[in-house]
C-alpha cells in the first residue's frame, strides 16, 4: 500500500468513527453494530448498521477497501483507456433513514480510486458528495444544507460549489420519472484537477462537513409529531430512493460488478417502502408542495 493510500485509509476510518459517534449521540438510543468482512478477490471493510433507534429507523455507515486486477465496467465506462488496469478503491458511504417523515433521509460518500499498470504512471482520482431527500420540505433546512456545502467548497475556488451542485442535481435524477430524488447538495467524480494534497484536502473538507450539514436539521425536526398519512407518504417517496439506487447509482453498480459484499451494498435501502399505482398527491397539499416547490431545479442560496 502506498503512502497516499495509507493516508486516505486512515482518514476514512477516522471519518467513519466520528460520524457514527455523532449520530449515536444525536439519536440517544441508537448503537451501530459493526460487521467486519473480507472480499475473496481482495480487500474488505467494516459495515456499521443501526436499526430501530429513537430517531434512526435504519442507517449504515460503511468503510470498504477493495482491490483487484481489472477495473469493473462501472468504473471504466467513462475512462475506457483504464480498462484492464489493476485497481484499489477506498471509501466511506452512508445512508440514514429516519423514522419521522419530517426528518430527511441523507446520503454521503467519499472515495478514492487508483488504477495501475506496470510500466505506466498510476492514475488516481477522488469522488463523493452528499445529498438530502426530504419528504416534507422546510426551506430553512434546504438553505442550511446548501450553505454548509458552499462553505466546504469555498477554499478551493468560487466555481467549485456551483459546478458540483449542478452535477448533483443532474446525477440524482430519476430519468424514467423525470424527477429529482431530493434537493441535492454536492456530487463529483474524477477529481484530480489539483495536485494530490489539494485534492485530498478537498475530500476531507466534504467528509467533515456532513455532520455539520445534517445534524442541525435532525435536531430541529426529530420531535415533530406526524400522522399515519404522512408516514405512508414517506414510504411512497422512499420508493423513488429504491428505484434510483438499484437502477442508476454508480456505487451500487460498482459494488455488485466488483464482487463486493451484497449486504453492505444494499444496506442503503430503506426498511419499509410502498408503491401505489399512478398515485398522485392532492393539488395544494403538503405532499404536492414537495414536488411543486422543493424538488425543482433551484438555487437555494440565491436569496439567502
Swiss-Prot record:
Signal peptide: none annotated. GO terms for cellular component: cytoplasm. SUPFAM superfamilies: Coproporphyrinogen III oxidase (SSF102886). Its EC number is 1.3.3.3. It is found in: Cytoplasm. Keywords: Cytoplasm, Heme biosynthesis, Metal-binding, Oxidoreductase, Porphyrin biosynthesis. Involved in the heme biosynthesis. Catalyzes the aerobic oxidative decarboxylation of propionate groups of rings A and B of coproporphyrinogen-III to yield the vinyl groups in protoporphyrinogen-IX. This is Oxygen-dependent coproporphyrinogen-III oxidase. It comes from Pseudomonas syringae pv. tomato (strain ATCC BAA-871 / DC3000). The lineage of its organism: Bacteria, Pseudomonadati, Pseudomonadota, Gammaproteobacteria, Pseudomonadales. The gene is hemF.
